[in-house]
A protein has these predicted regions:
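Cytosolic, long alpha-helical scaffolding segments
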Residues: 1-185
Length: 185
């Protein structure tokens, strides 16, 4: 009888370790993909000697990053609000984790922007660099704001406070849909 229980415990431990390793592997691969994207932009900016091409690459990089942040904001805001309305603590934790990943990614992107600004002509660098840093700060602020919205919702659900009534959910849902549609424009 003791041997069967020990074998069952070992099988359970093995299954747990396999699942845990798979989850950690996926996180690692996602992080490496984000780093690879940043590295490819850096290499393109370093390789170019033409100031106009550098400006074009810098604009493309800025546009892509800001669009990505707005799409991320739309998705995480929607997930955060619906996680709160549905009292889905797991979803709210996933949103918080995604926000932390995005914050670190935006820091890396800001460093790429610094490199990009150095590749531009001096007069253009002053003008475009200012807008780039301002855009990056706005993007960081959007992510920070969603975090500040998600934290109280997560705490509310985690502490098992009374849920929203249907009227509140309906009003909150309408407002959420308007904000998400605005971000997706």
């Amino acid at each position: 009888v003791g041997g069967i229980a020990a074998m069952a415990a070992m099988v359970g431990l093995a299954i747990y370790m396999l699942i845990r390793n798979q989850i950690l592997y996926k996180k690692k691969m996602k992080k490496e993909a984000m780093q690879e994207e940043v590295d490819s932009t850096i290499s393109k900016l370093r390789e170019t000697k033409d100031k106009r091409e550098a400006l074009s690459l810098f604009r493309e990089h800025s546009r892509d990053e800001l669009c990505d942040v707005l799409n991320f904001a739309s998705d995480t805001f929607n997930r955060s609000v619906h996680g709160f309305m549905d009292e889905n603590l797991r979803e709210l934790r996933k949103v918080m984790s995604a926000i932390e990943e995005k914050k670190s990614y935006l820091k890396q992107v800001k460093r790429v922007g610094t490199l990009g600004v150095t590749q531009l002509e001096h007069d253009i660098a002053i003008d475009k660099g200012l807008y780039y840093y301002q855009g990056n700060d706005f993007a960081s602020e959007i992510v920070f704001s969603i975090r500040r919205l998600t934290e109280p919702g997560k705490e509310h659900v985690d502490n098992h406070f009374s849920p929203l009534c249907e009227v509140q959910k309906e009003d909150f849902g309408k407002m959420t849909d308007e904000i998400v549609s605005f971000l997706n424009r």
